[in-house]
A protein has these predicted regions:
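N-terminal targeting or regulatory segments adjacent to alpha/beta-hydrolase or S9 domains
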Residues: 1-36
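N-terminal cap/lid segment of alpha/beta-hydrolase-fold proteins
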Residues: 25-66
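Short, surface-exposed "cap/lid" segments of acyl-processing enzymes
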Residues: 61-107, 111-113
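Short beta-to-alpha linker loops that shape the active-site pocket of alpha/beta-hydrolase fold enzymes
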Residues: 73, 115-119, 193
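Alpha/beta-hydrolase active-site loop
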Residues: 96-100, 129-151
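Alpha/beta-hydrolase fold nucleophile elbow
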Residues: 152-164
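Glycine-rich nucleophile elbow surrounding the catalytic serine of serine-hydrolase chemistry
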Residues: 162-172
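Hydrolase active-site cap/lid region
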Residues: 172-220
């Protein structure tokens, strides 16, 4: 169990991560590119539903099927450099989505992977504040509209692969704008986040008895 100073430092870092999607104030960098695993790709950019500029990759395959990938917090389209000391504290290991994209490509899927607002190379939205899906759903809508209007993807069979923050964002988007999902044939949502449970378990792990109340005051 950490001492009081260590617990407070961990708590402060957790609040910053939760509210801004950054680690110690830094966005996670994009360390890898699809060509590292032998994939051709193109850089793409398109607007969110509310106009925030989003950047990503389009990885083409010889098929009429498309997967749109929505990443987790505090990662990006590449994954997360948790193996680097300055981005540690989340398990200490790297998350690398590129082998996953390679497997999807080899299975016959085109892939659209992009950075959610305030992550990666995408623009800042809402003053840099993270909404755990309540704001980022607009980016999911933006990606759907982009895929629906892009000449080579508009007639493709479309599937969503959404992780953590991406899953929450997808769920909120689907709830608010179900008509935007008319062309979605399947959806995989990995680890959608229940905010209260995560906060309660975190403050318990650092021995902060009044941690949930402190967290609630810190973010409101």
């Amino acid at each position: 169990m950490p001492n009081d100073d260590q617990a407070q430092a961990a708590f402060d870092n957790f609040v910053q991560l939760w509210t801004t999607g950054t680690t110690a104030g830094r966005r996670a960098p994009i360390l890898r590119r699809p060509d590292e695993v032998g994939l051709e790709y193109g850089d793409v950019f398109f607007p969110s539903m509310d106009g925030v500029p989003l950047e990503g990759w389009f990885i083409p395959a010889d098929s009429d099927r498309l997967i749109i990938h929505n990443h987790f917090l505090p990662g990006n389209r590449y994954g997360y450099p948790g193996h680097l000391p300055e981005f540690g504290g989340l398990g200490g290991f790297e998350v690398n989505f590129l082998p996953e994209y390679r497997a999807l490509h080899d299975a016959g899927y085109n892939v659209l992977a992009y950075d959610i607002r305030n992550h990666g190379m995408s623009g800042q939205g809402n003053g840099g504040i993270t909404g755990i899906g309540l704001l980022e759903y607009r980016d999911v809508i933006g990606s759907l509209r982009y895929a629906a209007t892009r000449r080579d993807t508009k007639n493709m069979t479309k599937v969503l692969l959404s992780v953590c923050l991406g899953a929450d964002s997808t769920a909120v988007a689907w709830s608010k704008h179900p008509d935007e999902f008319a062309e979605i044939k399947a959806m995989v949502m990995l680890q959608p986040v229940s905010g209260r449970y995560i906060v309660e378990e975190f403050v318990k792990s650092i021995g902060m008895d009044d941690g949930y109340e402190k967290f609630d005051r810190a973010v409101h």
